[in-house]
Curated annotation (Swiss-Prot):
It holds the Pfam family p450. The gene is Cyp3a13. PANTHER family: CYTOCHROME P450 3A5, CYTOCHROME P450 FAMILY 3. This is Cytochrome P450 3A13. Can activate aflatoxin B1 to a genotoxic product. GO terms for molecular function: heme binding; iron ion binding; monooxygenase activity; oxidoreductase activity, acting on paired donors, with incorporation or reduction of molecular oxygen, reduced flavin or flavoprotein as one donor, and incorporation of one atom of oxygen.
Length: 503
């Protein structure tokens, strides 16, 4: 029996031509960086260099930074990705040329209504949404919202105290994941949930389902390898995000808005109410107001931006304090002096606590939750002699920048003093980017920092954390998604009341 099919010459020619065209499609962009003299790992047809991410984005970036120096080229499938680490070029991309050339982030496939979200929207639509949301995140508004955040620190302490009697190590992700979810649902949707003790609550279930994301998901991979499929999926109403989850949040926001309009609950201060209020502002151009769909999109993106980031950052902070007891003691001393007898934290007090600020900054240097920043180049441009073609994704490897010994002596060491007032002038602002920089930086930066700080203060007023036999030292990082521990981060939590009585 013949192993080779008995095709006609025309069929063989058609097959050969199809294979050649398919190969050219899968590789035609892969010569861009070679032509520009930019080094980088060798790409494979269709896949590009994505196999380099098998150990995690951050590990790939660290290794490339060591091997190739200030810049290198990658290919996510066929998409050229230019990594830059020069602070002057970073400043140009994030700040100077943000509005003209580097306005947009990369869009990863079909996202449904979330294309209206501030993190994903583009060009003039992004500018309009950013302008409408910016007043929501001012210091004044956050100060008004602070009591909502602060009430959940009491729940946080209660949940931590419940676990003390069991004699088991405490999972930081469980504790801070619940705290983060409680704050997000309260500030974004006006819903109060003790999520640790109410895991069956529909908000908890839907949020957890929403956050289950894998870069090797078949749909995500298909649009990475074949970007032309994105508009097809859009037309078919197929999204990377579960339809039932988006439908749940859409219905919830509509119902809450209707109830609040009936009750005329203008005095309520949370993100949802502030967005509803913005629809009623008297503006010269009525189309500038947020639509109901845009309000849903912002509420959902707040979950994405706030849940995993806050819970992971707090987990990393407690881990670092546990393995550096001298730093923990110094921070507790500052807290006790500023807030004697476990007095409740106030917004203004938190802003005045210098060592707390140093600890948070150093935590975010070692573990920047968004390990990369990205901007899409809208037109051919030359920056400081570097030519960047239109359509290139310019990537800033934050994790690698924060570990660069040229800017951070002994970068693996946890030293909050790097961020003291005495040393602040020596820090290049474009080498420390936990929240990005420029007009498209993280709009929720102040909210995230105050959220972290009030939780740390409340926990350290009541407890001391210590490593235990189950604590993984050094910490291994997950290869998936945002920066987070690969395994559960377990610590021993000791009540400070016990510590004092023992002394």
């Amino acid at each position: 029996m013949d192993l080779i099919p008995n095709f006609s010459m025309e069929t063989w020619m058609l097959l050969a031509t199809s294979l050649v065209l398919l190969y050219l499609y899968g590789t035609h962009s892969h010569g861009i960086f070679k032509k520009l003299g930019i080094p980088g790992p060798k790409p494979l047809p269709f896949l590009g260099t994505i196999l380099a991410y098998q150990k995690g984005f951050w590990e790939c970036d660290i290794q490339c930074h060591k091997k190739y120096g200030k810049m290198w080229g990658l290919y996510d499938g066929r998409q050229p990705v230019l990594a830059i680490t020069d602070p002057d070029i970073i400043k140009t991309v994030l700040v100077k040329e943000c509005y003209s050339t580097f306005t947009n982030r990369r869009r990863f496939g079909p996202v449904g209504i979330l294309k209206k979200a501030i993190s994903i929207s583009e060009n003039e639509e992004w500018k309009r949404i950013r302008a409408l949301l910016s007043p929501t995140f001012t210091s004044g508004r956050l100060k008004e919202m602070f009591p909502i955040i602060n009430q959940f620190t009491d729940v946080l302490v209660r949940n931590m105290r419940q676990g003390l009697g069991e004699g088991k190590p405490t999972s930081m992700k469980d504790i801070f994941g619940a705290y983060s979810m409680d704050v997000i649902t309260a500030t974004s949707f006006g819903v109060n949930i003790d999520s640790l003790n109410n895991p069956q609550d529909p908000f908890v279930e839907k949020i957890k389902k929403l956050l289950k994301f894998d870069i090797f998901d078949p749909l995500f991979l298909s649009v990475t390898l074949f970007p032309f499929l994105t508009p097809v999926f859009d037309a078919l109403n197929v999204s990377l995000f579960p339809r039932d989850v988006i439908s749940f949040f859409t219905t919830s926001v509509e119902r809450m808005k209707e109830n609040r309009m009936k009750e005329k609950e203008k005095q309520r201060v949370d993100f949802l109410q502030l967005m509803i209020n913005s629809q009623n502002y008297k503006t010269k151009e009525s189309h500038k107001a947020l639509s109901d769909v845009e309000i849903v999109a912002q509420s959902v993106i707040f979950i994405f931006a706030g849940y995993e980031t806050t819970s992971s950052a707090l987990s990393f902070a407690l881990y670092l304090l546990a393995i550096h007891p001298d730093v923990q003691k110094k921070l507790q001393d500052e807290i006790d002096a500023a807030l004697p007898n476990k007095a409740p934290a106030t917004y203004d007090t938190l802003l005045q606590m210098e060592y707390l600020d140093m600890v948070v900054n150093e935590t975010l240097r070692l573990y920047p939750i968004a390990g990369r920043l990205e901007r899409v180049c809208k037109t051919d441009v030359e920056i400081n002699g570097l030519f960047i073609p239109k359509g290139t994704v310019v990537m800033i490897p934050t994790f690698a920048l924060h570990k660069d010994p040229k800017y951070w002596p002994e970068p693996e060491e946890f030293r909050p003093e790097r961020f003291s007032k005495k040393n602040q002038d020596s820090i290049n602002p474009y080498m420390y980017l936990p929240f990005g920089s420029g007009p498209r930086n993280c709009i929720g930066m102040r909210f995230a920092l105050i959220n972290m700080k009030v939780a740390l203060v409340r926990v350290l007023q009541n407890f001391t954390v210590q490593p235990c036999k189950e604590t993984e030292i050094p910490l291994k990082l997950s290869k998936q998604g945002l920066l987070q521990p690969e395994n559960p981060l377990l610590l021993k939590v000791v009540s400070r009341d016990e510590t004092v009585s023992d002394e």
